[in-house]
């Protein structure tokens, strides 16, 4: 026969671990909060951090500052990289100067393919955007996402 104290400890341990697990699962998939600041600022946002393999990913590039930002192409400097820094996706875009006004945002949808059209595998990836360096204010922002099976 199992002592009452052991049963109480086991039940409380199982219940407590469920509560803690649910808490961490909720905060792990929270989207970051956008904060607007004075001066130049660039933000990248997705609706969540964890995505299923093959799920379209909406990427927002936002001017979260008070001055216009200049980009060297129509894709607003968007690149998808592996964590080791190798770029494997960059949208096809015209090489024209693009300007993002304060509080303006541009949305791109990435269908989890590489630039050569092949599908990616599950893993961690970095979404990066950077402004044109000729304007004097070189800004680069990145976020990390997880692709799960």
Model region roles, listed by residue range:
Residues 1-2:
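N-terminal Lys/Arg-rich, disordered targeting/topogenic segments
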Residues 5-87, 91-92, 100, 130-149:
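Primarily secretory-pathway and cell-envelope proteins
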Residues 90-115:
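Intrinsically disordered, low-complexity Pro/Gly/Ser/Thr-rich segments with frequent PxxP/GP/PP motifs
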Residues 105, 119-131:
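A short tyrosine-centered beta-strand micro-motif
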């Amino acid at each position: 026969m199992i002592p009452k104290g052991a049963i109480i400890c086991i039940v409380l341990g199982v219940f407590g671990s469920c509560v803690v697990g649910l808490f961490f699962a909720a905060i792990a998939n929270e989207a970051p909060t956008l904060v607007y600041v004075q001066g130049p600022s660039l933000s990248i946002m997705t609706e969540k951090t964890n995505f299923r393999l093959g799920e379209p990913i909406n990427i927002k590039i936002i001017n979260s500052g008070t001055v216009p930002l200049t980009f060297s192409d129509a894709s607003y400097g968007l690149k998808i990289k592996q964590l080791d820094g190798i770029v494997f996706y960059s949208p096809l875009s015209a090489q024209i100067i693009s300007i993002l006004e304060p509080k303006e945002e541009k949305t791109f949808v990435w269908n989890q393919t590489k630039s050569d059209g092949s599908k990616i595998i599950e893993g961690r990836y970095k979404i990066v955007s950077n402004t044109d360096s000729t304007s004097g204010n070189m800004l680069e922002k990145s976020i990390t996402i997880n692709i799960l099976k």
